[in-house]
């Protein structure tokens, strides 16, 4: 038991040291790059709810490399590197692969895990839950309900009212402020 604790302590210390390093710019896109990436993606829509089915080759052509790696290859971005980790504007978070609404900003909280965390999805159908037994762990993977992009995982150690912690890779999230979302809603309605 003592040996296990020593190994765990060393591993945690090494992880903390590597996580504190600055992230590479390749993981972050400025808003201009993100907008042009959205324009190249024919399935990206914040209003269309139809299911998206594409081959991996098609996804590879339309998604930025960092989004493709996490969304389609079930990768994980480095903790504490997401621009949404310490981001608290009011609005809605969307799937970066297809534009599906995922979370309201009111459900975001600081879990200390290094990734954006939420306690409740925007709707029941916005997230798909899949058993994940990789890496010697038993977890529940979260996928986008529209395009099945890998988002992250959900754990049962979150705050009230749900007790859930949706630990999401920020690179697979897009964000629109409440004002932007309201404007698009009004334009769509007219």
How should these model regions be labeled?
Residues 28, 34-35, 189:
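Polybasic, lysine/arginine-rich low-complexity segments
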Residues 27-30, 40, 136:
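Short hydrophobic/aromatic-rich motifs at helix boundaries and adjacent loops
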Residues 1-31:
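Bacterial Sec-dependent N-terminal signal peptides
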Residues 51, 60-94, 100-190:
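A short Gly-Trp-Pro
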Residues 34-55:
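Short, contiguous pre-domain boundary segments
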Residues 4-7, 49, 124:
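Low-complexity, intrinsically disordered short peptide segments enriched in small/polar/basic residues
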Residues 10-13, 55, 76, 111:
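Acidic, low-complexity intrinsically disordered regions
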């Amino acid at each position: 038991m003592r040996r296990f604790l020593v190994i765990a302590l060393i591993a945690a210390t090494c992880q903390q040291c590597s996580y504190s390093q600055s992230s590479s710019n390749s993981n972050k896109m400025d808003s201009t790059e993100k907008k042009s990436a959205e324009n190249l993606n024919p399935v990206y829509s914040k209003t269309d709810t139809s299911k998206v089915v594409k081959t991996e080759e098609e996804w590879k052509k339309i998604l930025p490399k960092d989004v493709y790696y996490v969304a389609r290859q079930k990768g994980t971005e480095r903790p504490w590197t997401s621009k949404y980790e310490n981001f608290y504007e009011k609005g809605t978070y969307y799937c970066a692969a297809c534009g599906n609404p995922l979370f309201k900003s009111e459900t975001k909280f600081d879990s200390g895990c290094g990734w954006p965390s939420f306690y409740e999805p925007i709707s029941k159908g916005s997230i798909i839950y899949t058993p994940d037994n990789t890496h010697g762990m038993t977890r529940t993977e979260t996928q986008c309900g529209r395009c099945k992009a890998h988002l992250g995982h959900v754990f049962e150690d979150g705050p009230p009212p749900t007790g859930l912690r949706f630990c999401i890779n920020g690179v697979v999230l897009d964000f629109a402020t409440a004002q932007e979302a309201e404007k698009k809603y009004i334009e769509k309605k007219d």
